[in-house]
């Protein structure tokens, strides 16, 4: 049966209206790894301010060049406590800000000592941070996991090496399909090790400072 012209117009307008309705964008899933040096402490403030825009799967403290282990300073816990004070006001603008208790529950320590700057798999010891990355890459959530290396990438290298060595080929394939590594230059040997030994992993390097202190992008 041929549809009347008026009915055709109504159907067309209805479909057009549906297509014009904005779809809720899926939040990117993020694990941030940080060395706790002063630039990262500043970045963490901004990270928390924008935490309504992404799904925080983990915050992992990793190695830096200035001293052994910033985790003992409890600087992230202090920042999250301040975030909790601001949370009621933040949620007036966006209800999607995560609970402070949740952020503390996904906080872990990775390979954070300066000596780990010079170690590579399989010489790195296991860590809570590596296990958090492993659990996230192997869980049932199919979304990509954007692992942001503000400091070194040895903890990420350690986690990926463990998955490839200790888990099934199917689980390794799942990890490969989900992992998205972003490195703010290779601050230890981990990023280059992943690039050379696990070429199937998607990895981006942002660049390194030149002698004038400027940043050049090599992504």
Where do the PLM segments sit?
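Bacterial N-terminal signal peptides that target proteins for export
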Residues: 1-8
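Hydrophobic h-region of N-terminal signal peptides that target proteins for export
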Residues: 11-20
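N-terminal acidic, glycine/proline-rich low-complexity segments
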Residues: 21-219
């Amino acid at each position: 049966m041929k549809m009347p012209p008026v009915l055709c117009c109504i159907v067309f307008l209805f479909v057009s209206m549906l297509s014009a309705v904005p779809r809720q964008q899926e939040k990117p899933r993020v694990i941030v790894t940080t060395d706790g040096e002063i630039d990262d402490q500043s970045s963490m403030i901004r990270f928390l301010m924008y935490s309504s825009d992404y799904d925080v799967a983990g915050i992992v403290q990793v190695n830096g060049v200035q001293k052994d282990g910033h985790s003992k300073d409890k600087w992230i816990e202090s920042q999250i406590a301040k975030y909790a004070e601001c949370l009621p006001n933040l949620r007036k603008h966006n209800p999607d800000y995560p609970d402070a208790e949740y952020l503390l529950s996904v906080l872990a320590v990775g390979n954070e000592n300066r000596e780990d700057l010079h170690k590579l798999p399989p010489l790195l010891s296991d860590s809570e941070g590596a296990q958090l990355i492993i659990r996230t890459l192997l869980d049932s959530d199919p979304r990509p996991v954007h692992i942001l290396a503000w400091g070194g990438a040895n903890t990420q290298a350690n986690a990926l090496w463990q998955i490839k060595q200790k888990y099934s080929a199917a689980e390794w394939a799942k990890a490969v399909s989900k992992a998205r590594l972003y490195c703010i230059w290779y601050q230890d040997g981990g990023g280059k090790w992943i690039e050379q030994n696990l070429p199937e992993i998607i990895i981006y390097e942002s660049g390194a400072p030149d002698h004038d202190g400027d940043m050049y992008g090599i992504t």
